[in-house]
């Protein structure tokens, strides 16, 4: 079993090393195939361990006092490993098609392999320090992949934005880990959680808050949310991987993994739930008006992450993990479908300039319809089951304000999901392109995700039974909630269909103040640029001038003065002085030797 766990972890790393050998060579398709097979091997091992349902620890060596280099294989880590493995395998095979004509083909697969390895390292680690190493690894890889086409300044800026914003949040997480080590004397999960109740409550509040700040950055929660939509600059398979299985799900995983700590600080947990509810409706509102195909799906990710944090914040950690898993399947399906549309439309992303794509892209349209139905939470698709449980638990736990916000967000989710479908596939064509369906390998790569987007929800009971060894089972099913959620989703879908079929919204709506507010992301990016980025740039300019005209000149003056002194000392008439210095130095050296 331990060998299988290590194979699962290191297979993507081997893929990274293999592809790196060809990184500077011309495109070789076998590189993509071998890397994809290695990641598939990792997924197979993870799934085998999942079905065996055997928890164990792999301890390799001690880093330093209180921290071992090891991995915990339990229900939580195996669930994450399996989700990461399945999605990563599909994305790898899909990338063979998507990146076929890119000169960086080999390098792309190297980065993908390292990305998957870092995420697996994160979820398998048995201590907070190992988690942080994987955490920084996915941050680095996201920077490499978002800025993969770095010659484009916009893409490069988006990569830097994601990297810097995550580094700011990671500082909070690092402080939390340091404080936890000072309080507990260890960072190993089992040891920390066993002594958690004996730790000072105020210290726990500080630790939990700092850890969540890190989670906010990685999972793009407000106010660290702006990087997520801009990260769409990267290749579409990267978007699928970041939004479905790696990177953004790491923050949710951290809160679930540290559930023992968060149970002891309900005040922090409740703030997490409130923030999640706010982000759910905040992101959904922006997705209503966005014209960029990938950004719509990105905002839907942000909204669904809000749902997950609501569940985790209210203590329903198993439900949060269930929604994380189901969301991974239909979200990656949607992103890969968007990749097919982009490929057919010569990389155009404006959905207002699409339409009429159902006939030429029939299979892609069906796949994206399935993904959208799951995202909207319509029965019997996967999203219905997991989202319904989050709504149900917020209702039965008497957090009716949060429930109402999530219900409105569910309505908005259905609306923007079907708005996307209508404008892309089912309204008259508004373009001059000659679109064609994606290759068979791309469609085959999407097939497992399609199946899971349909059936994953039906494994609800077996999923929670499997998790019962690590997380408390909560029965959150409620008939009233189920009816309300279904009605909200169906109404949202029907309204979008009729609105865009009958052209209810004219172009003049874009002049509306509310529309401008939403389409400009509530002007938050502009606020950041004007009051933070521009001020930082001004400070940098001042420091640059100080460096050039003050510090550099001081150094030059010191160097010139030293040069003049040295020249005087080596003049022939200074030989007597030099001999005196030599004798004095020799005497001092003898005294030091004698003292020793």
From Swiss-Prot:
UniProt function note: NDH-1 shuttles electrons from NADH, via FMN and iron-sulfur (Fe-S) centers, to quinones in the respiratory chain. The immediate electron acceptor for the enzyme in this species is believed to be menaquinone. Couples the redox reaction to proton translocation (for every two electrons transferred, four hydrogen ions are translocated across the cytoplasmic membrane), and thus conserves the redox energy in a proton gradient.
Family annotation (InterPro entries): NADHpl_OxRdtase_5_subgr, ND/Mrp_TM, NU5C-like, Proton_antipo_N
EC number(s) per entry: 7.1.1.-
Entry's localization field: Cell membrane
Main location: membrane
Bilayer topology annotation: Multi-pass membrane protein
Sequence intervals crossing the membrane: 4-24, 31-51, 80-100, 104-124, 162-182, 204-224, 236-256, 270-290, 305-325, 365-385, 395-415, 441-461, 480-500, 576-596
A single Gene Ontology CC term: plasma membrane
Protein name stated in the entry: NADH-quinone oxidoreductase subunit L
Catalysis performed (reactions): a quinone + NADH + 5 H(+)(in) = a quinol + NAD(+) + 4 H(+)(out)
């Amino acid at each position: 079993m331990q060998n299988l766990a290590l194979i699962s972890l290191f297979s993507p790393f081997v893929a990274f090393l293999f592809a790196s050998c060809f990184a500077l060579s011309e495109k070789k398709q076998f590189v993509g195939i071998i890397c994809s097979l290695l990641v598939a091997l990792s997924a197979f091992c993870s799934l085998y361990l999942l079905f065996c349902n055997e928890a164990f620890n792999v301890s390799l060596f001690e880093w330093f006092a209180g921290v071992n280099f090891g991995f915990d294989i339990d229900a939580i880590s195996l669930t994450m490993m399996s989700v990461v493995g399945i999605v990563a395998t599909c994305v790898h095979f899909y990338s063979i098609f998507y990146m076929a004509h890119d000169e960086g083909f080999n390098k792309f697969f190297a980065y993908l392999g390292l990305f998957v390895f870092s995420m697996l390292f994160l979820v398998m680690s048995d201590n907070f320090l190992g988690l942080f190493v994987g955490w920084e690894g996915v941050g680095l890889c996201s920077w490499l992949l978002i800025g993969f086409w770095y010659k484009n300044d916009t893409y490069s800026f988006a990569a830097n934005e994601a990297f810097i914003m995550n580094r700011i949040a990671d500082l909070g997480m690092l402080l939390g880990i340091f404080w936890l080590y000072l309080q507990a004397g260890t960072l190993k999960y089992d040891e920390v959680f066993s002594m958690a109740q004996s730790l000072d409550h105020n210290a726990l509040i500080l630790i939990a808050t700092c850890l969540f700040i890190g989670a906010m950055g990685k999972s793009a929660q407000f106010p660290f949310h702006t990087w997520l939509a801009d990260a769409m600059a990267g290749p579409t398979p990267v978007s699928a991987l970041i939004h479905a299985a790696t990177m953004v799900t790491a923050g949710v995983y951290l809160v679930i993994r540290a559930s023992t700590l968060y149970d002891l600080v309900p005040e922090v947990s409740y703030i997490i739930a409130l923030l999640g509810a706010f982000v759910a409706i905040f992101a959904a509102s922006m997705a209503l008006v966005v014209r960029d195909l990938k950004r719509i799906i990105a905002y839907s990710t942000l909204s669904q992450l809000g749902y997950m944090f609501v569940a985790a914040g209210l203590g329903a950690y198993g439900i949060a993990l269930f929604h994380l898993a189901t969301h991974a399947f239909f979200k990656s399906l949607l992103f890969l479908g968007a990749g097919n549309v982009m490929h057919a439309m010569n990389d155009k992303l404006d959905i207002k300039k699409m339409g009429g794509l159902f006939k030429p892209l029939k299979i892609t349209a069906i796949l994206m319809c399935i993904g959208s139905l799951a995202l909207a939470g319509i029965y019997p698709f996967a999203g219905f089951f997991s989202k319904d449980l989050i709504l149900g638990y917020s209702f039965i736990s008497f957090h009716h304000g949060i429930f109402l916000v999530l219900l409105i967000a569910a309505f908005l989710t259905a609306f923007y999901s079907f708005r996307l479908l209508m404008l892309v596939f089912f309204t008259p064509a508004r373009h001059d392109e000659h679109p064609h369906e994606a290759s068979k390998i791309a469609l085959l790569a999407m097939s497992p995700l399609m199946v899971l987007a349909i059936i994953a929800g039906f494994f609800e009971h077996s999923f929670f039974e499997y998790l019962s060894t690590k997380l408390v089972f909560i029965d959150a099913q409620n008939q009233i909630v189920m009816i309300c959620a279904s009605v909200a989703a169906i109404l949202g879908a029907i309204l979008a269909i009729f609105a865009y079929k009958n052209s209810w919204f004219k172009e003049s709506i874009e002049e509306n103040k509310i529309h401008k507010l939403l389409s400009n992301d509530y002007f938050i990016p502009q606020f950041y640029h004007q009051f933070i980025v521009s001020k930082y740039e001004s400070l940098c300019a001042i420091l640059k001038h100080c460096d050039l005209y003050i510090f550099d000149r001081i150094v030059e003056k010191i160097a010139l003065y030293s040069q003049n002194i040295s020249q005087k000392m080596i003049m022939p008439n200074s030989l007597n002085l030099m001999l005196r210095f030599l004798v004095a130095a020799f005497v001092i050296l003898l005294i030091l030797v004698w003292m020793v």
